[in-house]
């Protein structure tokens, strides 16, 4: 009988060892998981990096600013800024008694390339609250001696907007053609709605 007791004890000990080994294995898996998730945070503030250099109006790339040969005054800077606005140069024209249309010359760059006249606006507020750009002509054109050029008009055509970031942020309301009234109210050129 003592042999039978030894076998039963030995069998019971083997079963107990198997259960402990099995439990240890499961426990090891729980201690070393295969996946771990964590959280990260970032806070954005409105930018105020100064004036953004002008970019090519037809192929805007912030890493390739253009270099105008006769730049206008520096832009406004700030979180919402007008960075660049072309000078309108109509050249020397012959006086005529007939109605004439004169076109502003393209902006000449220091590399010799020519770009259409344009205005560049940068919005670094991060609010998507929209903005508007209006233009005005404070008074009628005048000759060098100060005489008004009666009936002269400043007309903008083919207006369009381009976004450097994503087409989703391109202003949807762009006045593609507008005529200014000398001494009149501001005329809306672009409305970047929120």
PLM regions with names:
Residues 3-10, 24-194:
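Signature of Gram-negative chaperone-usher
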Residues 12-21:
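Bacterial N-terminal signal peptides
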